[in-house]
Amino acid sequence: AICSLVLYLLTLMLMEKLSSNSVDAQEVELVWTILPAIVLILLALPSLQILYMMDEIDEPDLTLKAIGHQWYWTYEYTDFKDLSFDSYMIPTSELPLGHFRLLEVDHRVVVPMESPIRVIITAGDVLHSWAVPTLGVKTDAIPGRLNQTSFITTRPGIFYGQCSEICGANHSYMPIVVESTPLPHFENWSSLLSTSSSL
């Protein structure tokens, strides 16, 4: 519709059916300025509302706190008492056969699939960034500030990520591994980890 209107006006101007009075008319310029502004506002307001609605999950099934350190991650499952661990990269010399070099960790983040997960992210020392591209997640970890992101996994699997903020000499040795499992498996894993950490 817009292209046809522009072509129509261009044709009229080329055929000189628009006089110089109508081309230089301030009323036309005023309409051409105000009308697009109104259209842009009408498009922007609902878009901003939807953007903010997508940003935060009101009632997540699980809240996880990720704390970046030089050069490892600490995870705290805030819905459980005493369920936290440090996650370090497995050195190449200790890597089991078939695992990914520089991407495998000694303790994976395990989450139930098909559940809304909120991750609260911060740092204990310098800037870090918790990024898992296959989940569409990248959030900066800033000392003294809590940032949050959320995701839902729709299938079981293992999702790899990295710290994506240059944080020092061993920046590339801060992998993130998220394992999505069915709810019964997650419940077994969390009870086993809670029991072993309380001993």
Swiss-Prot record:
Lineage: Eukaryota, Metazoa, Chordata, Craniata, Vertebrata
List of residues binding Mg(2+): E165
Function per UniProt: Component of the cytochrome c oxidase, the last enzyme in the mitochondrial electron transport chain which drives oxidative phosphorylation. The respiratory chain contains 3 multisubunit complexes succinate dehydrogenase (complex II, CII), ubiquinol-cytochrome c oxidoreductase (cytochrome b-c1 complex, complex III, CIII) and cytochrome c oxidase (complex IV, CIV), that cooperate to transfer electrons derived from NADH and succinate to molecular oxygen, creating an electrochemical gradient over the inner membrane that drives transmembrane transport and the ATP synthase.
Localization, UniProt: Mitochondrion inner membrane
Catalytic activities: 4 Fe(II)-[cytochrome c] + O2 + 8 H(+)(in) = 4 Fe(III)-[cytochrome c] + 2 H2O + 4 H(+)(out)
Family from the record: Belongs to the cytochrome c oxidase subunit 2 family.
Gene that specifies this protein: MT-CO2
Subunit organization: Component of the cytochrome c oxidase (complex IV, CIV), a multisubunit enzyme composed of 14 subunits. The complex is composed of a catalytic core of 3 subunits MT-CO1, MT-CO2 and MT-CO3, encoded in the mitochondrial DNA, and 11 supernumerary subunits COX4I, COX5A, COX5B, COX6A, COX6B, COX6C, COX7A, COX7B, COX7C, COX8 and NDUFA4, which are encoded in the nuclear genome.
Mitochondrial matrix topological segments: 14-26
InterPro entries the UniProt entry points to: CcO_II, CcO_II-like_C, CcO_II_C, Copper_CuA, Cupredoxin, Cyt_c_oxidase_su2, Cyt_c_oxidase_su2_TM_dom, Cyt_c_oxidase_su2_TM_sf
Protein name, as recorded: Cytochrome c oxidase subunit 2
Cofactor comment text: Binds a dinuclear copper A center per subunit.
The keyword Methyltransferase belongs to this UniProt entry's keyword annotation: no
Cofactor: Cu cation
PANTHER family with a match to the protein in the record: CYTOCHROME C OXIDASE SUBUNIT 2 (PTHR22888:SF9), CYTOCHROME C OXIDASE, SUBUNIT II (PTHR22888)
Organism: Apteryx australis
